[in-house]
């Protein structure tokens, strides 16, 4: 298999300030959606960064600390209630836009994982971007760790839903817990699950 150059898109826009953005939490039945934006420093490449889903929890946590200590980054969180109000796609797009707006450095190009379309012309959608862009991969790590930590806190409040294990996703055990205990205040009412 051919090695992917994770800096291809960053090099393509080498004269620009480039941010990568990714989200965590589009599919779960409970909790917020989180988007993170990261501007990497091409002179200080952190090794091991790749799509958060391909990393162990321990490695994600270590890389999160390195990314947030060395790069410009920002995160936005959209609550489960707002997801229900505006739908998950619009909530995700809103989180992405807020995360970019919260960066301390204004990007000229924003690489976005997936195929979402934005009115802001700086946004460039890249399907499978978390496997093709180092900036997006770094953002995927920050978003996932941030959301997992939020769900861990919620799990301490409502342990019966096992969010410390499932992060709010519709696992068999989570759906069984909903059937036994009903929906919690943190479940998305617009997601029909059981």
UniProtKB/Swiss-Prot annotation:
<comment type="similarity">
    <text>Belongs to the RNase HII family.</text>
</comment>
<dbReference type="InterPro" id="IPR036397">
    <property type="entry name" value="RNaseH_sf"/>
</dbReference>
<comment type="function">
    <text>Endonuclease that specifically degrades the RNA of RNA-DNA hybrids.</text>
</comment>
<keyword id="KW-0479">Metal-binding</keyword>
<dbReference type="GO" id="GO:0043137">
    <property type="term" value="P:DNA replication, removal of RNA primer"/>
</dbReference>
<keyword id="KW-0255">Endonuclease</keyword>
<feature type="domain" description="RNase H type-2">
    <location>
        <begin position="16"/>
        <end position="194"/>
    </location>
</feature>
<dbReference type="GO" id="GO:0032299">
    <property type="term" value="C:ribonuclease H2 complex"/>
</dbReference>
<dbReference type="GO" id="GO:0030145">
    <property type="term" value="F:manganese ion binding"/>
</dbReference>
<dbReference type="InterPro" id="IPR012337">
    <property type="entry name" value="RNaseH-like_sf"/>
</dbReference>
<keyword id="KW-0540">Nuclease</keyword>
<dbReference type="InterPro" id="IPR022898">
    <property type="entry name" value="RNase_HII"/>
</dbReference>
<feature type="binding site">
    <location>
        <position position="113"/>
    </location>
    <ligand>
        <name>a divalent metal cation</name>
    </ligand>
</feature>
<keyword id="KW-0464">Manganese</keyword>
<dbReference type="GO" id="GO:0006298">
    <property type="term" value="P:mismatch repair"/>
</dbReference>
<keyword id="KW-0378">Hydrolase</keyword>
<dbReference type="GO" id="GO:0004523">
    <property type="term" value="F:RNA-DNA hybrid ribonuclease activity"/>
</dbReference>
<dbReference type="InterPro" id="IPR001352">
    <property type="entry name" value="RNase_HII/HIII"/>
</dbReference>
<keyword id="KW-0963">Cytoplasm</keyword>
<dbReference type="InterPro" id="IPR024567">
    <property type="entry name" value="RNase_HII/HIII_dom"/>
</dbReference>
<dbReference type="GO" id="GO:0005737">
    <property type="term" value="C:cytoplasm"/>
</dbReference>
<dbReference type="Pfam" id="PF01351">
    <property type="entry name" value="RNase_HII"/>
</dbReference>
<feature type="binding site">
    <location>
        <position position="23"/>
    </location>
    <ligand>
        <name>a divalent metal cation</name>
    </ligand>
</feature>
<feature type="binding site">
    <location>
        <position position="22"/>
    </location>
    <ligand>
        <name>a divalent metal cation</name>
    </ligand>
</feature>
<protein>
    <recommendedName>
        <fullName>Ribonuclease HII</fullName>
        <ecNumber>3.1.26.4</ecNumber>
    </recommendedName>
</protein>
<dbReference type="GO" id="GO:0003723">
    <property type="term" value="F:RNA binding"/>
</dbReference>
């Amino acid at each position: 298999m051919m090695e992917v150059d994770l800096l291809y898109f960053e090099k393509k826009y080498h004269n620009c300030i480039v941010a990568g953005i990714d989200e965590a939490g589009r599919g779960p039945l409970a909790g917020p959606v989180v988007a993170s934006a990261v501007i990497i420093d091409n002179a200080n490449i952190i090794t091991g960064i790749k799509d958060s889903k391909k990393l162990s929890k321990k490695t994600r946590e270590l890389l999160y600390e390195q990314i947030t200590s060395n790069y410009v980054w920002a995160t936005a969180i959209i609550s489960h209630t707002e997801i229900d109000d505006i739908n998950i796609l619009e909530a995700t797009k809103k989180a992405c836009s807020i995360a970019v707006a919260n960066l301390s450095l204004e990007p000229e190009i924003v690489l976005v994982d997936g195929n979402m379309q934005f009115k802001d012309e700086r946004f460039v959608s890249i399907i499978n971007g978390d496997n093709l862009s180092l900036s997006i991969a770094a953002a995927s790590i920050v978003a996932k760790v941030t959301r997992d930590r939020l769900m861990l806190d919620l799990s301490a409040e409502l342990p019966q839903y096992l969010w410390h294990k499932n992060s709010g996703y519709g696992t068999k055990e989570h759906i069984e817990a909903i059937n036994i205990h009903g929906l919690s205040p943190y479940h998305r009412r617009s997601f029909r699950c059981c």
